């Protein structure tokens, strides 16, 4: 699994737990709708830590909490 796929998988899992939609990141985190769409539709190339931090801070979790998931053990790239 590619890192970007694992990031999206993890974001979707957290979103399901918190019952939120991708639009939440635009409204509450100021992330551009186009950036959100590209990420969730697999059109985002590489995900930078700065970009990911925008999502985690909007969710109220640390990067450490975000990456503390077995899905990242499956990353091969």
What do these predicted regions represent?
Residues 1-21:
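A short, Lys/Arg-rich alpha-helix, primarily the initiator
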Residues 19-38:
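Short alpha-helical DNA-recognition segment
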Residues 27, 41, 68:
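Phosphate-coordinating loops and pocket residues in cytosolic domains that bind phosphorylated ligands
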Residues 38, 67-77:
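Short, charged recognition helix plus adjacent turn
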Residues 43-54:
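Short, basic-rich loop-to-helix N-cap that marks the start of a DNA-contacting helix
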